[in-house]
Each structure stands twice: as C-alpha cells, then as structure tokens.
C-alpha cells in the first residue's frame, strides 16, 4: 500500500486512532514506526502514574496491522487481527509511546509481525514486546 495512503488511514480515517492522536512516523514496506503522545487520560495506574495497558496493546496492534498492510499491493485489502500476544516489560511513563513493527511472514491470507514499544527518551528500554497474526482479505476482482 502507498505509504501516504496508509498514513492517512491510520491518522485520519480510523476514529479511535484519531481520538488517541496516533501518528505514523515512518512507513516502509513491511516495517512501520508509529507513536501516540501522552495525555493524562491514558493513565491506567493512578498510584504509579503508569500508562494503561490497553493503550500499549492498542499501539502494538495498530503497528502490527500497519506493517502487514504496508506490504500489500492491493489498496482495498482488509487486515484484521486473529491473535496477538503482548508481554508488558515495564510501566509506560508519562511521555510519548512509540511502537515499531516488522513483518515476519506474509502469505496470501495471513501476515505475522513482531512489535516493540518504547519511549523516545529511552529507546533501548522496551516497555512491551508483541507478536501478532493478521487475516488478509483481498476483495473479489482485485489484483
């Protein structure tokens, strides 16, 4: 998929992403880097002021799906999550969260990705890692 079209879908056309402020930082074929800026509504643990785990898993899933989509030539293809595992390694702090995803395998109907999430201030310290499997549907009559 064209990187500019994928960026528009992720940032503007998916209401949930738009609500959270998801930004596509880098899009290459089979590899994406996206981020969500911190805001107080994203806190899930008020005692530690840690980011909600749902925000972390959402960003992992969005990055993984985008990595699959970025490798597809058919712009009308649909990508949906079949299975996803997220390992939470440390609390997310009150700052921008970044997710990098890379395509591990792309088949006709399935895509597999690895994801890594971190803060820009400490890129070597993973907040979470993940692996996901996505279903790919190419509409009838498409290439």
Give the residues covered by each predicted segment.
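Short beta-strand segments enriched in hydrophobic/aromatic residues
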Residues: 38, 72, 134-136
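Active-site helix/loop of acyl-thioester processing domains in fatty-acid/polyketide metabolism
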Residues: 51-74
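Hydrophobic alpha-helical segments of small multi-pass membrane proteins
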Residues: 54-58, 62, 83-88, 115-118, ...
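N-terminal structural module
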Residues: 7-21, 25-29
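A generic structural signal for short beta-strands and their flanking turns/coil linkers
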Residues: 20, 30-32, 78-84, 95, ...
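HotDog/MaoC-like acyl-thioester-processing domains
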Residues: 92-94, 98-143
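Hydrophobic beta-strand-centered segment that forms part of the acyl-chain substrate-binding groove
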Residues: 67-98, 103
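Catalytic strand-loop segment that frames the active site of acyl-thioester-processing enzymes
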Residues: 23-50
């Amino acid at each position: 998929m064209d990187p500019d079209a994928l960026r528009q879908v992720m940032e503007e056309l998916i209401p949930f992403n738009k609500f959270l402020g998801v930004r596509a930082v880098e899009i290459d074929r089979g590899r994406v880097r996206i981020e969500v800026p911190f805001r107080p509504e994203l806190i899930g643990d008020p005692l530690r002021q840690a980011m909600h785990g749902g925000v972390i898993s959402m960003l992992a899933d969005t990055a993984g799906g985008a990595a699959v989509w970025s490798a597809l030539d058919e712009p009308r293809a649909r990508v949906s999550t079949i299975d996803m595992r997220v390992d939470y390694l440390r609390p997310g702090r009150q700052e921008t969260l970044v997710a990098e995803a890379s395509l591990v395998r792309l088949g006709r109907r399935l895509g597999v990705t690895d994801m890594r999430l971190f803060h820009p201030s400490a890129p070597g310290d993973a907040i979470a890692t993940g692996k996901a499997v996505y279903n790919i549907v190419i509409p009838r009559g498409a290439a």
